[in-house]
Amino acid sequence: MAGEKAPAAKPDATKKSPAKKADHARGKAKKKTLAEKKPKKGKPHCSRNPVLVRGIGRYSRSAMYSRKALYKRKYAAPKSRIERKKKREKVLATVTKPVGGDKNGGTRVVKLRKMPRYYPTEDVPRKLLSHGKKPFSQHVRKLRASITPGTILIILTGRHRGKRVVFLKQLSSGLLLVTGPLSLNRVPLRRTHQKFVIATSTKIDISGVKIPKHLTDAYFKKKKLRKPRHQEGEIFDTEKEKYEITEQRKVDQKAVDSQILPKIKAVPQLQGYLRSVFALTNGVYPHKLVF
């Protein structure tokens, strides 16, 4: 109708102002950055191969291969030998050189690696490389941190097992030089392996003790006794050669023990401790003992 005004258009609720759009975009960007920062956590699951006994699973290796569908994985095929040979550059063994003269053919094939001019008259054996392996004499000798000079050790094997001894030093072969002393527990100067001893927390200060330099591995090496040969008329009279302690051993034993005994006597109850023999009784567990 004439004179009437058209109703004003209502603002669209779905449309947003530019300021609100900018805030919305910022919020989305923040959410994206937070999502990127947080690593996706996979769902924890137990093994597909339940354990029957410790170290033994329910399914075999071939069964697990099919259960895990490992056959679907794609592996790069290894390069064939022919492809490897193609890539390798051939090292030339000979070179062709020009030669002067009309009747010499123009070129000559010459070896790059020339043969020796002289040969040895006798065959000399060559020493083969051992590829980093060293002989036993050059092996690194390591010592347990608990074993230091003056430590009381408990011997676990041999004729003196269970006895307590004093550690003196480590020899070049890696064996330990120990002594009883002889007057306390009848253990002489002898070698023993660090595998077969228990290091106790009891220690003696032997920094002032002078150990003879000739007490080496060669000194303690056992000499082979000669076997008696049967001769006519002496079949029953022959006797086996017996091992006898040399005078040098006796002198060295006294020299070392005379220096260690005063230091043992200075500590109360240490003499009785060295005389006693280590043994386990009922209810005593070695892994729970503090030595």
From Swiss-Prot:
The keyword Aminoacyl-tRNA synthetase does not apply. It holds the Pfam family Ribosomal_L6e. It is found in: Cytoplasm, Cytosol; Cytoplasm; Rough endoplasmic reticulum. The modification Phosphoserine is found at residue 130. One of its GO terms (biological process) is ribosomal large subunit assembly. InterPro entries: 60S_ribosomal_eL6, Rib_uL2_dom2, Ribosomal_eL6_CS, Ribosomal_eL6_KOW, Ribosomal_uL6_N, Translation_prot_SH3-like_sf. It comes from Oryctolagus cuniculus (Rabbit). The modification N6-succinyllysine is found at residues 97, 210. The keyword Acetylation applies. Component of the large ribosomal subunit. May bind IPO9 with low affinity. The lineage of its organism: Eukaryota, Metazoa, Chordata, Craniata, Vertebrata. Residues 1-11 have a biased composition (Low complexity). Residues 1-51 are annotated as: Disordered. This is Large ribosomal subunit protein eL6. It comes from the Eukaryota. One of its GO terms (cellular component) is rough endoplasmic reticulum.
